[in-house]
Amino acid sequence: MPYKAIDIAKYIINKCTIDKHPISNLQLQKILYYIQKDFLKSDLIAFNDEFEAWQFGPVIPEVYYLYCVFGALSIRMKYNIILNSDYAIIINPIIENKRQLNPWDMVEDTHMPGKAWAQIYNGLGNHNVIPKQLIKARG
């Protein structure tokens, strides 16, 4: 059964804090997106929450608003959250890989023409839902 995006977000933040590689809210949003995309490509769902097309890419509003007080600063928080090992084995390498990237490179990647964010943002506009099937098909 899928988790809530906020629980996956807390897991990501906790892992990055413990690993001494804290991330910003922008990075968190992109990592959540890459996790969901990888799950969807395997016909699975990491979380049921919907991404919206915002100016700087796909965003889970509930997660964004919880951590927006940090602005562009790193989120250094620890949570006592454990994921099912089947989830962790997929999620951990994504976190470890994507947190190394420049967040603006991830923004550029999600904004590429033809990808899911670009289709929704440039078609319907800001804050519209990006359907999971489109994320699966277009990334």
What are these regions (language model features)?
Residues 1-139:
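Domain-edge interaction signal
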